[in-house]
From Swiss-Prot:
Keywords (A to Z) from UniProt: Aminoacyl-tRNA synthetase, ATP-binding, Cytoplasm, Ligase, Nucleotide-binding, Protein biosynthesis
Protein name as catalogued: Arginine--tRNA ligase
Alphabetized HAMAP family for the sequence: Arg_tRNA_synth
Recorded family membership: Belongs to the class-I aminoacyl-tRNA synthetase family.
Subunit annotation: Monomer.
Length: 581
């Protein structure tokens, strides 16, 4: 139950009864919880339509509200705010209801939808680096959130395995090892099962090949020709390319596994290649495609968005072509209700073109919504894209090692590697996901690793503190679900209990915002606020030495609720919680 929605529906009945549009009855969480819990600001915009002062409208609304079981206090403040304070029993009962529900008050979306999530997107032959973490962590959080809310999710890594970089690699290897059988056009036998290069060598070859092609137009033409021949099915090139893909996927899977990020599909641009001819024929049959200066293009029919080049002058296909073919493939194979691309904002124009063409040509069905989650860049303290001290790109494995080093330095007596890894992952993931995805942000590992403030280790520390209370009372193998039947939250005895209850019942609000806006930072902010409320409760509301048994059990119930809410919230952003720290 989203408490904002519940209160809005309660007020909407009064608005309707008085002849006002229900849309003005929206209730939001107050930014001043010391003054009120929630507020309704609808009287101000409503005044223009009702031809009444907003203060008079607000007073009229409050006069007609009859819900003493929900509200302890309803006050009107200038120029027309309705300030809401919840009744203590309603607050306690709602907290209990959430504690005893599987998803802490979150209800499944109805009807359930099928959502394809395209994220990760590493390129073959390139090791993953710090710049890849945004797509990986944001996409993983979104798949967790969508599944939690009841959607059927299909996640696809969508490897970059079919572009000009493949031709660059082929030509570079041909230059250094021309004797390899892959380059003999007359060869008809079986190709070796082992790759002629390792993934480490591939990572060294690509920058060299890229540099050569950028500095020499003739070398670039060779790479383009090799790419074209690969896409046309030249046997030796296909066999060599298959080696590139296999060894790259093996390495990338290890990187994603280290982040606890997993995919349902490991497809790439190449997997859509077999659909391109069918799709082009469809475009031609329906007069969507036309020739322009030797290339074949499709108009987007959107102001300011240029046509999409589908086939180049040389007959090769473009990045946009394979993206369209991927949409074609996903529509036929999966029939999704939504496809979400988690790709950085520098690709915004590209996706506007692809989405516009896909919708105009009906590559996707009318029911299918296309969304680009366009995230900002990961920058260092200097405001530029994050680099190592030596000025190079930091590989993901090195970043994780650094995070573990920070965790170990702050806990020198901790010898459990699994706990160090959990702290390191919380450091990296929370440090990234606490930011609104649309913004660039500064990646400061030293700051993210602090055990105080808005950090992952602070959240872990808080939950471990709450768990230790329960462990001291119930032993190591306690089960919150079964215990919650006998431990009930009661009306708050002080402001710390009240604020903790109020924070707990806002969990469904945070989840809904994260779900609807593809913004996991709402869950991060919720978890941080809940951690603050619990730590104040912990300091000011003793449990172990209480003589009042009913109050003791009520506070234990609040500890249970905190552990449950924090555990679910942490899991939604891909963070696992240790038993101790």
């Amino acid at each position: 139950m989203n408490i904002e929605n519940y209160l809005s529906e309660t007020l909407a009945k009064v608005f309707q009864k008085l002849g006002y549009a229900e849309s003005f009855a929206k209730v939001v969480t107050s930014t001043r919880e010391d003054v009120r819990h929630f507020q309704c600001n609808g009287a101000m915009p409503l005044a223009k339509f009702a031809k009444k002062p907003p203060l008079a409208i607000a007073e009229e609304i409050v006069e007609h509200i009859d819900a003493e079981d929900i509200f302890a206090k309803l006050e009107v403040a200038k120029p027309g705010f309705i300030n809401i304070t919840l009744a203590p029993k309603f607050l306690a009962d709602t907290t209990n209801r959430f504690l005893n529900s599987n998803k802490f008050g979150v209800q499944n979306n109805l009807p359930n939808r099928k959502v394809v999530l395209d994220f990760g997107g590493p390129n073959v032959a390139k090791p993953m680096h710090v710049g890849h973490i945004r797509s990986a962590l944001l996409g993983d959080a979104l798949q967790r959130i969508h599944r939690f809310c009841g959607d059927t999710v299909v996640s696809d890594v969508h490897l970059g395995d079919w572009g000009t970089q493949m031709g660059m690699l082929i030509e570079e290897i041909k230059l250094q090892s021309p004797q390899l059988v892959y380059f003999d056009e007359n060869y008809t036998g079986e190709y070796p099962t082992e790759s002629p290069v390792t993934v480490q060598e591939l990572a060294e070859i690509y920058p060299r090949a890229s540099k050569r092609c950028k500095s020499d137009i003739n070398e670039m033409e060779k790479a383009r020709l090799a790419t074209f021949e690969l896409q046309q099915g030249r046997r030796g090139y296909v066999a060599l390319w298959q080696h590139f893909v296999r060894i790259s996927i093996d390495a990338v899977k290890k990187d994603f596994d280290s982040l606890d990020v997993h995919f349902d599909l490991w497809l790439g641009e190449s997997d859509a290649n077999k659909f391109i001819d069918e799709m082009i024929s469809y475009f031609q049959a329906n007069n969507f495609i036309y020739e322009d200066e030797g290339a074949w293009v499709i108009d987007t029919n959107k102001d300011g968005v240029p046509p999409l080049i589908v086939i180049k002058k040389d007959g090769g296909v473009m990045y946009g072509t394979t993206d369209l073919a991927t949409l074609w493939q996903r529509s036929k194979d999966l029939d999704p209700d939504e496809i979400i691309y988690v790709v950085d904002k520098r690709q915004s124009l590209h996706f506007k073109q692809v989405f516009s063409v896909a919708e105009r040509t009906k590559v996707v069905s009318e029911k299918c919504k296309l969304k680009h989650v366009a995230f900002g860049t990961v920058n260092g303290k200097d405001g530029r894209p994050f680099k190592t001290r030596e000025g190079g790109v930091m590989h993901l494995a090195d970043l994780i090692s650094q995070a573990k080093e920070y965790a170990k330095n702050r806990m020198p007596d901790e010898n459990d590697d699994s706990i160090i890894n959990q702290i390191a992952m919380a450091t990296i993931k929370f440090g990234d996901l606490i930011n609104n995805y649309a913004n660039d942000y500064f990646f400061d590992l030293e700051k993210f690793a602090q055990h105080e403030g808005k950090t992952g280790p602070y959240l872990l520390y808080t939950v471990v503190r709450a768990k230790s209370i329960l462990r001291k009372i119930f032993g190591d193998n306690y089960d919150i679900k079964s215990l919650a039947k006998d431990y009930k939250v009661v009306n708050a005895h002080n402001e710390y209990e009240e604020k903790l209850q109020l924070q707990l019942i806002q969990f469904p609000i945070a989840v809904q915002r994260a779900y609807e806006n593809s913004q996991p930072h709402h869950i991060c902010e919720y978890a941080y606020s809940l951690a603050n409320s619990f730590n104040k409760f912990y300091v000011n509301c003793p449990i172990n030495n209480l003589d009042d048994e009913s109050l003791k059990k009520a506070r234990i119930a609040l500890c249970m609720a905190t552990v449950k809410a924090m555990t679910i919230a942490s899991d939604l952003i891909g963070i696992s919680i240790p038993e101790r720290m």
